[in-house]
Amino acid sequence: MTLNSLPAWTALQSHFEQIRHARLRDWFAPENDHTPTRAERFTIPGGGIAADFSKNRINDDTLRLLVQLARDAGVEARRDAMFAGEIVNPTEGRAALHTALRATDPQAPFHAQISAERAKMATFARAVRSGTWTGYTGKRIRHVINIGIGGSDLGPKMVVHALHHVATPEITTHFVSNVDGADLARVLEQVDPEETLAIIVSKTFTTLETMTNARSLRDWFVARGCPEDALAKHFVGVSANPAEVVKFGIAADNVFEMWDWVGGRYSLWSAVGLSIMIAIGPEQFDELLAGANDMDRHFREAPLERNLPVLLGLIGIWYRNFFGSQSYLVAPYSEALHYLPSYLQQLEMESNGKSARLDGTFVDYPTSAVTWGEPGTNGQHAFFQMLHQGPTIVPIDFIAVLTPEHPLASHHPKLLANCFAQSEALMLGRTLDEARKVAGPGKEALAPHLTFPGNRPTTTLLVDALTPRTLGALIALYEHKVLVQATVWDINPFDQWGVELGKILGKVVEADLSAESIDPAKHDSSTTALIERARAALKR
């Protein structure tokens, strides 16, 4: 049965027509806000996070029908299949067991294998952090360079930045991902080879960007005096292809394993997170895993009506497929979460930016929305104008941390006030009559410019403090949200075939950039002209 033919989908279409013009302002009006209040009814805790869904354009009937849609689409069955280690990535014939990486049950899939690899990580991380692992001249490691791209970069970078307040001050962690040499060059300006450890992270150990940077970094070490037989003091590899790591020149003892049943964008919990463990320590890394496990248990055990990943995913579908929203915004009011929007861009769009259903037919409805964002309050001075007064509705996830992780506590009330005020302003808006009063006498022409449509939907996620545990729960919340949406849309969130064609053609174009001549029939006229211009520039 296709999505459009599910009874709950049909019922939601009728329900949407009934409430599409309803005003949140009216739903919050005192005469309508009974006990329990709307905020109390639509605020749900889970995994150390409280989610306030009350400023969304939903009522009790909306949630009831959305939850029925989840049941009709088989969300519970697919969730259970994923946790059990069944093949939920059919195009690649794989399980998706990122949840096993943080499971505490000894009966969980691959528990012994995971525990052994984590113990190896912990031993190494402690040696680096304590200074017993040294560089080739005997100096302690003070810089770690993580070289990877996509899931081998975005997750670790986001977490290390977020947990700076619990990281060791003895070691600075750098992240290099782009094949643009400027990325690596700028990091190399800051580090001393005698005190630098490189972590090369690639599932296949053949990724173009990662291996290009890794080779350049190896050459840099040698050029600055590191003997080739001492490179083992400065290079470790993380991969599902250990043989290729050794072939590159990294000692077998310096190889940490990841597995093909963990997708790259879900892999920070594995050895891909080695840079995280070195930064914050094995004990805090365990707390990160524990927080994710808290959310895993909530996702498995909470009824769908009170299940944060389920509701977050379903409300996203409500706006994407019924209101026609093209994008949604993630606005963490926390500078520590600066890289969370970038991380979620990959998690959501690489997972659910698909057009083919699981059976190979093509969807006739939208799937992943464009995910974007910026920390508050920066975004208020950049794009919030459009959110408040533009004609396009952009649903927003606000994320607020109630207690600061830094010593400048006097800043924090201002930060929280802005977050909460933005959600209220987006919901309330300002009518033309109200705008006339604000404009004042004799300024009637200004009033339309001072109106705000309001009725703009937002969800606010609250955590008491940003700790490894609450961060782990927050990340897992969005991981499971992705699965919920993929299940309803009947797509595979665990593959990424969309990245392949460009990579294949990229190799052809790269060869043409250094060729003596180009066959004009090989490319379209635009691509040929671009190559010719670049060839001329590269020869200068």
Curated annotation (Swiss-Prot):
Top-level class of the enzyme under EC nomenclature: isomerase
A Gene Ontology cellular-component term: cytosol
Cleavable signal peptide: none
Taxonomy, superkingdom: Bacteria
EC number(s) per entry: 5.3.1.9
Active-site residue list: 350 (proton donor), 381, 503
The UniProt record lists the keyword Isomerase: yes
Molecular functions per Gene Ontology: carbohydrate derivative binding; glucose-6-phosphate isomerase activity; monosaccharide binding
Cross-referenced PANTHER family: GLUCOSE-6-PHOSPHATE ISOMERASE (PTHR11469:SF1)
Stated role: Catalyzes the reversible isomerization of glucose-6-phosphate to fructose-6-phosphate.
Similarity comment text for this entry: Belongs to the GPI family.
UniProt protein name: Glucose-6-phosphate isomerase
Species of origin: Burkholderia lata (strain ATCC 17760 / DSM 23089 / LMG 22485 / NCIMB 9086 / R18194 / 383)
